[in-house]
Amino acid sequence: MEEFQGYLELYRSQQHDFLYPLIFREYIYALAHDRGLNRSVLLDNVGYDKKSSLLIIKRLISRMYQQNHFLISVNDSNQNKFFGYNKNLYSQIISEGFAVIVEIPFSLRLVSSLKETETVKSYNLRSIHSIFPFFEDKFPHLNYASDVLIPYPIHLEILVQTLRYCVKDPSSLHLLRLFLHEYYNWNTLITPKKSIFAKSNQRLFLLLYNSYVCEYESILLFLRNQSNHLRLTSSGILFERIRFYEKIKYPVEEVFANDFPATLWFFKDPFIQYVRYQGKSILASKDTPLLMNKWKYYLVHFWQCHFYVWSQPGRIHINQLSKHSFDFLGYLSSIRPNISVVRSQLLENSFLMDNAMKKLDTLFPIIPMIGSLAKVKFCNTSGHPISKSSWADSSDSDIIDRFVRIGGNLSHYYSGSSKKKSLYRIKYILRLSCVKTLARKHKSTVRTFLKRLGPKLLDEFFTEEEQIFSLLFPRTSSTLKRFYRGRIWYLDILCINDLVNHE
């Protein structure tokens, strides 16, 4: 953010917080290019960095200044009068630059909030594994949980409208509408994997989608925090940011005439917890199923009336935590009783007491993981290892390095499993698939190839943590056994591996 704060101070005084003029500045595209070189593993490099040049950007800006050529050609699929023969490249450059521009208000707000709260900038706060200690602390005391799939907006205009609270510049919003109308079918968001997360413009659409989710969560969490005060009072929600909330004395129907078709009564639940990752969230509560059903139907009406997004109640599943497990972030988590026997002695009498405590159990999803490995041809659907034929043309070191990297990533991510037996089975599949791939390359049998290499090949699959612990402690020590049995949550995991995401 510091790299363009100087530019922002200049344009604030001249343009009254307008972001639109920045689209004509070359340094914006230079920033987008530099960020593309250092982008996270979530965003794949699709060739924009190789094709981008200062000459192309200058040509693009000069064409944007020529307003006579700013024409919409809906029927032309690959070229138009504005972009000529480089429509795909120009559209990608504009989307990258526009994403940087629209991120400016969010970045400024983030910097100011970090200064106010004196929060230390740390990647540990972004770790996915930090969610599971929260589960261990809160969920054993709760009774019910609902899996909530956040619906995708049907129309791109919904995504544009969510930006109007942060982007005060109408010209920027109109430019975004024009860009989306020119290059995307407004009605294709029903199949989000093909449109909203297209690799060529993933940064822009992630920004739009995250702003939509942020808008939804800001209202939801506000209601959750205020629900304790609304036990006996009918209250209306005004979804404009200026008058966000007020208590009312007149009937609720008058307030909800535009947003809700019926009276909405709030309810008290001080033990409700909310967790989300990407488009899936979990709403857990200690109260009765009736209360969870109220939240369920409230969310459905909320999406339909405020965001104009159609959602069915069947998309929200309510389960009892003690009887059902929930799938979140690649783990199958459940609450099970942990009974410990305590011996108590009073004078001459002694007796045993069973102390039952609830504990979070995080299991490795063996069946979905075998399905993921079968999709990428590491094994068959039964879990029997097979050779990776597409890698047989690579060098031996490259083949081994690929398998070791996949096994290490899975071991690192699933280090929090309560039972490691299923994880060891997956590592065995990867080891044997690696050996079969090498044997196929050298036109040999697996047994002959293993005899030639010896146990050194299998030692490559031990993670760095396992190697360090095996050197520090003997294999029979209790510390090493606790390492293999216990759960470890790492604070450096920022995204889910493709094999972990089974959907």
UniProtKB/Swiss-Prot annotation:
Sequence similarity: Belongs to the intron maturase 2 family. MatK subfamily.
Alphabetical UniProt keywords: Chloroplast, mRNA processing, Plastid, RNA-binding, tRNA processing
Compartment annotation: Plastid, Chloroplast
GO biological process, one term: tRNA processing
Organism of provenance: Rosa californica (California wild rose)
Reported function: Usually encoded in the trnK tRNA gene intron. Probably assists in splicing its own and other chloroplast group II introns.
Pfam families: Intron_maturas2 (PF01348), MatK_N (PF01824)
Source species, domain of life: Eukaryota
Protein known as: Maturase K
Primary residence: plastid
Residues annotated as signal peptide: none
Gene behind this protein: matK
